[in-house]
Amino acid sequence: MADTTSTSKGTTSQTISDTAKAAEEFLSTLSDEQKEQVFYNYDDETKSTSWSNFPVTFVERSGIKLGDLGETQRAAALKVLKALLNDEAYAKVTGIMAGDQYLKDNANASDLGDTQYNIAFFGNPSTTNDWSIQFGGHHVGINATFSNGTITFAPTHLGTQPTTYTDSNGQTQSALGDMYQTAFDFYNSLTDEQKQKLYQGEEVKNLTCAPGDTCDYPTGTGIKGSELTDEQKQLLLKVIANWTNLADSQTTQATMDQISATLDDTYVNWSGATVYDTSQGKGIYFQISGPKVYIELASQDNDAGATVSGVQTSGWGHIHTIYRDPTNDYAGSVTQQKSSGPTGGGPGGSGSGGPGGSGAGSGGPGSGNGGPSDAPGRSGAPAGAPGAPGGKPGDNESGQTSSSTSKSTSKSATADS
């Protein structure tokens, strides 16, 4: 297979060791009450629904928010992420967060920003026992599970808005630009006959499998891997590596080997633009679906209320993606539960109450029917920990009013420090 791995780190065992050490150092900066917020049992099903494309103000996350930490604590939390990810992936995730801060600063999006991200541990950090990290907020949902000496990043959500912008230093930023480029490298390698099988029409579809929700892993549509040349297969693997090449080279190689072994039975389909020209059209949608991989990318035909003059924040400029392993999400530690809150991020207009919006529209933040007055808090959480949010979020990102995001979580009350 093609070399799609990072050279910045070497082995899975080293990543596990470095990440566990960084996690312990982060925990040493926290109070007992803060530790209680961070810890969950390894098999707590909360992990299956507490990641999303939505901001944390719309979908409650597990763990503790970076914005609720002191400067030293926040730096220690990010060191956990840096120990886990390779250099390219760390830059990708922090680049997404920087884009969120850009929207806060330039689009009056008060519920966004680079501190609106949560970190949680499911199980105790260890080099031998199973545990997992969940890190997420707007357009980020990292689920890294350490099990039996392996690391899996399925499922993971990565998105971005805006896809490309100029920062305060005059530098062009594009956290997920490689996703578009590698996709078109693959598309342009196909013959006309192959493109006819691949292409599903002009409509840019939304994600079929939303972050933090159940998924039926549809397959069988488009072109089959066995119909590709060896060169085309390598280009397809480079597309897939945007999601699988997140940690050390050994971890990436192990995942890619499994995907490569079943690539002939993997289908790819595509809709939307057929030329990589961000000045035209509304972007693209593609789906890669096989025995060991499920990936979707969908450009979003809405800016969710985050408008910046002269900057694309919808269409090409707003991306949602999903990566899952149909056989090994969360390393089998939990069964995916159905989301009780908003999901997806459809191509339907800007939506009332989006980031930076007034929230005055139907279903805006704080409107709608609130949850029950006795909405449960987190079992085992510190005394006085807040219960689940009562009001319904607005239609930020999805173009639809959603059900309440209230949920009960079963937390570990015996987490080691």
Q: What positions do the PLM features span?
A:
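Extracellular mucin-like PTS domains
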Residues: 401-412
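A cross-kingdom marker for long, charged
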Residues: 3-32, 36-71, 75-86, 90-374, ...
